[in-house]
Amino acid sequence: MREWEAFISEEERKIYEKAGYKGKEKFGVNPALLIIDVITGFTGTKPMPVMDAIDEFPTSCGQVAWDALPKIQQLLHACRDAEVPVIYSTSDPDFKAAFGNATKRGVDATDFEKLAVQFPEMIKPNDDEFIVRKARASAFFGTHLITYLVRKNIDCL
């Protein structure tokens, strides 16, 4: 059993199986890695318990984000080594004026907010990697992501 499967009840497994969600999905032939919102606003600036981390950024996940970073970094390096395109998403405080904020915390784009949308050093994008800058929670709404995927013929993320 894979580690995450321990969190799925037997009843849920039966539901998934009966509904036809069993086995592995096949990947496409031209995949890309999409790293969604792994930014300072969700990781914080350093490892710390979540109750302390939210004093720095109310959206921070605290220590669990820092625990995930080495795993994300490992996947990132594997994709780069295999020449799989890497795409990042981040919020863009400057877009909020046009599209509105993703939450009810309307704040002007301050230096603090600009720090929040930066990527942690250990998974920082290379210069040739695509960054989706967004005003809303979705990496697709009001962004160029679909255009990028179609132009690059990417068929799975």
Write out the residue ranges for each language-model feature:
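Active-site acidic carboxylates
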Residues: 1-126
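Internal catalytic-core helix/loop-beta-alpha segment
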Residues: 113-156
